[in-house]
Amino acid sequence: MRKLYCVLLLSAFEFTYMINFGRGQNYWEHPYQNSDVYRPINEHREHPKEYEYPLLQEHTYQQEDSGEDENTLQHAYPIDHEGAEPAPQEQNLFSSIEIVERSNYMGNPWTEYMAKYDIEKVHGSGIRVDLGEDAEVAGTQYRLPSGKCPVFGKGIIIENSKTTFLTPVATENQDLKDGGFAFPPTEPLISPMTLDQMRHLYKDNEYVKNLDELTLCSRHAGNMNPDNDKNSNYKYPAVYDYEDKKCHILYIAAQENNGPRYCNKDESKRNSMFCFRPAKDKLFENYTYLSKNVVDNWEEVCPRKNLENAKFGLWVDGNCEDIPHVNEFSANDLFECNKLVFELSASDQPKQYEQHLTDYEKIKEGFKNKNASMIKSAFLPTGAFKADRYKSRGKGYNWGNYNTETQKCEIFNVKPTCLINNSSYIATTALSHPNEVENNFPCSLYKDEIKKEIERESKRIKLNDNDDEGNKKIIAPRIFISDDKDSLKCPCDPEIVSNSTCNFFVCKCVEKRAEVTSNNEVVVKEEYKDEYADIPEHKPTYDNMKIIIASSAAVAVLATILMVYLYKRKGNAEKYDKMDEPQDYGKSTSRNDEMLDPEASFWGEEKRASHTTPVLMEKPYY
């Protein structure tokens, strides 16, 4: 056994040595061999013909008689551009004795910055109507909000009513339309609760006491158990009012209820179910709608403020371009544009309901037009025997660009991958606050990324291995826009970007290898697809040291396990008592049938089929 241990240990050390130092080959001799990215262009010339031979031009690398072959010359760039203003010395990323090759890798410098605008990923549920999860209460399944980001400015409008949705729900002998959506009064009071009251209530709770006000409000609402069912994972939503610093727990999770089958807009019929819908309204601009799943770090990962001097775009091989296919609407201001985006955003509202005709009208129209399906739907309404549990997962028209000059709101459903610097635009999302704006466009992002990529690439090539003329070779990334035009190394004179508050320059004479399709999808051009067939979508990291450390640690762990095993073999094996198996705790009642009851528990004795069902909407009695 000891011999086996020694053999395994020696093998482990040999494996570690191979990872760190290889088997004698010089990695730097072939820096692009077996590489998926950053390969020099040998077959495709990305520059116009007049720039293929920079030695024939006025500005060169001071190597007129160097005798370089054509393959080397086609990658060279003139150092100074005719008519270009020289950049300050500290901003010039290249020296005059360097040969520049252009990378093939079409990376996106905006990836990290734009992560919070990937709403499908960061929010993961509906926005206009959020019913993204199901939970069981007292043996019955209900839907509930589940979005991971706050929805700023969202509220509920009760149709034809002076009652606001933050009014406590009607209880006992009250008429239905006398109440709203909020939790009824309790002793002690749990809703509404001020920020100071919540801080005091949770002052000894290490997990809650230091949370921000929105997350604290969400967790406070999540502490309430419906119907005293402690086994239920149903959690109430909440609304936080920034103006008075109050957290309102919502007893009703439904956010939309329309149609003559489900509600009555007649205000005089006080005890009939009211109609309601979600909205971003002037009355709600201080409100924030919260689900049980709001993440603790929402300020970092979720959008809140709108972006001034910016418009959402798509990153297309070196530059951020306009989204070509959008839906355009008129909007007097940013608030109206944000409201429009919200109305068209991702929604979990069920689709199977009739929101216009009453049962009598449907029967009448059915006989008149000999439409049997219409007559059938009056007696057997859609949803009565089949629950419509549509979940958007955050997919929808969640983004918009507002043009302050033309007063047009451009709305689209494709995830933006970059920002365009434009003084006439404000970028907004359905999650964002309808009014709040920030003006901090990252003007240095491109220049910083160019520098970072060159430094990263320098680890893969020998910068000190100069050619006969003392020239160094660097690999420049495919970024063709920057506030430092010298960093672009453009074969033509870069153009100034109009309406740019960052004073950007763009290089337009380099052929693009990608394009945008009719459905707003960025794809590699046909002539370059073979070259990019084996390149992964995501840029690999070059932090080889992390891989080495991880591999070494794994080998060390293996060696330690072997040592412990051999040590234990020397003596008698110790006997360990098995932990007692956990006792069966109370479990919520499970349903054997998959066809859940789709009828809403609307207030009153009669149950009606509803498109909002199954949502917990029971009248509380005391």
Swiss-Prot record:
Residues 1-24 form the signal peptide. Pfam families: AMA-1. Belongs to the apicomplexan parasites AMA1 family. Residues 25-546 are extracellular. GO terms for cellular component: membrane. This is Apical membrane antigen 1. Glycans are attached at N286, N371, N421, N422, N499. It is found in: Membrane. Disulfide bonds join C149-C302, C217-C247, C263-C275, C320-C418, C337-C409, C443-C502, C490-C507, C492-C509. It is a single-pass type I membrane protein. The lineage of its organism: Eukaryota, Sar, Alveolata, Apicomplexa, Aconoidasida. Keywords: Disulfide bond, Glycoprotein, Malaria, Membrane, Signal, Transmembrane, Transmembrane helix. The gene is AMA-1. Residues 568-622 are cytoplasmic. Involved in parasite invasion of erythrocytes. It comes from Plasmodium falciparum (isolate thtn / Thailand).
